[in-house]
């Protein structure tokens, strides 16, 4: 079993956190000590316990290694915008060494760390750099989450090409049905199965947020065991 991997999305709002929770559930069912890491998150809120991001809160709740919030999400930005815009507005410089130190600490405390990105693969964290540069530095294998909707085929193939161009391995992909009315669902899945350079880890059906529990049954982890 690999000790850490990165969850990338074909876009923002494609269900990275939903897929991450499902994967964490599946890893928990295997008896592994799991940690979740959301290095950078925008659109956070301060509800009296410091600035926290809802996605990071959800991930922290599902992973079974108990961690302080700051260990899960070192950079929680308030503005609901691209991280580079939010960081500049808040006079924050996202330091890759901080991200790397946090990841190393979580590796020591767990069997496997799920690292969830922000937005799409090439999301900027400053005017000059993207989060993908840090993922390259860490040489993290990637699981790609595809939000199944019109246009997702091009987004998925282009994202996969970019990840591979960056010299990283895609170890699997997850289909997340973000729109119950999407037509030609089966045909879209078949094309992705044919074109993606990695195995499908699972398909997550569309469901209201209140029913998003025990989702590990939708994930098959064989690819992560290599």
Swiss-Prot record:
Taxonomic superkingdom: Bacteria
CDD domains associated with the record: DTBS
Protein family membership: Belongs to the dethiobiotin synthetase family.
Residues noted as binding ATP in the record, renumbered to the chain: 13-18, 55, 116-119, 176-177
Protein name as catalogued: ATP-dependent dethiobiotin synthetase BioD
Signal peptide range: none
Gene3D superfamilies, sorted: P-loop containing nucleotide triphosphate hydrolases (3.40.50.300)
């Amino acid at each position: 079993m690999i000790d850490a991997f990165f969850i990338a999305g074909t876009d923002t709002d494609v269900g990275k956190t939903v897929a991450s929770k499902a994967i964490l559930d599946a890893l928990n069912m295997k008896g592994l000590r799991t940690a979740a890491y959301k290095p950078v998150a925008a659109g956070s809120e301060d509800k009296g316990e410091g600035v926290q991001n809802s996605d990071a809160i959800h991930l922290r709740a599902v992973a079974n290694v108990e961690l302080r919030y700051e260990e899960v999400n070192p950079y929680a930005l308030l503005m609901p915008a691209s991280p580079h815009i939010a960081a500049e507005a808040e006079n924050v410089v996202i330091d890759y060494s901080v991200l790397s130190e946090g990841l190393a600490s979580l590796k020591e405390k767990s069997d496997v760390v799920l690292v969830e990105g922000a937005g799409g693969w090439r999301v900027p964290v400053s005017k000059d750099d993207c989060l993908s540069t840090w993922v390259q530095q860490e040489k993290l294998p990637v699981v790609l989450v595809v939000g199944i909707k019109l246009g997702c085929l091009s987004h998925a193939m282009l994202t996969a090409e970019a990840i591979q161009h960056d010299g990283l391995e895609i170890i699997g992909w997850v289909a997340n049905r973000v729109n119950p009315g999407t037509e030609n669902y089966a045909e879209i899945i078949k094309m992705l199965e044919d074109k993606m350079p990695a195995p499908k880890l699972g398909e997550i059906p569309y469901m209201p947020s209140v029913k998003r529990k025990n989702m590990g049954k939708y994930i098959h982890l064989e690819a992560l065991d290599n």
